[in-house]
Amino acid sequence: MATVRAKFWVTGIRHLHQPSPDQVFAEITLAPVYAGQDGKPANADWSKATPSGEIKMGVTNPAAIEKFTLGQKFYIDFTPAED
């Protein structure tokens, strides 16, 4: 199986009000990084030019929400999944 690796960064964390105080919901938004620290394209595996895209996740686990901070970078591996 071939894997495509993408480097994304957190561009938004939006906390939404929930009717119950013990419920949480945050919308986490990520976008592709344009260049690596060495100035070379960070996402050359999948984009020959300026990479574009967006990942949005609705997260309801407080421990998971705490793992994301604005500006933080992540590698995201796309590996085919079986049914």
Model-identified regions with their sequence ranges:
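Structural detector for short beta-strands of small beta-barrel domains
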Residues: 3-16
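Short aromatic-glycine-enriched beta-strand elements
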Residues: 22-31
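Basic, polyanion-binding surface patches
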Residues: 37-38
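Short, compact, well-ordered microdomains
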Residues: 54-83
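Short, basic/aromatic beta-hairpin or loop at an interaction surface
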Residues: 42-55
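A broad, low-specificity signal marking well-ordered, structured residues that form hydrophobic/aromatic
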Residues: 8, 28, 55
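Short proline/glycine-enriched turn/loop segments at secondary-structure junctions
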Residues: 18-19, 45-47, 64
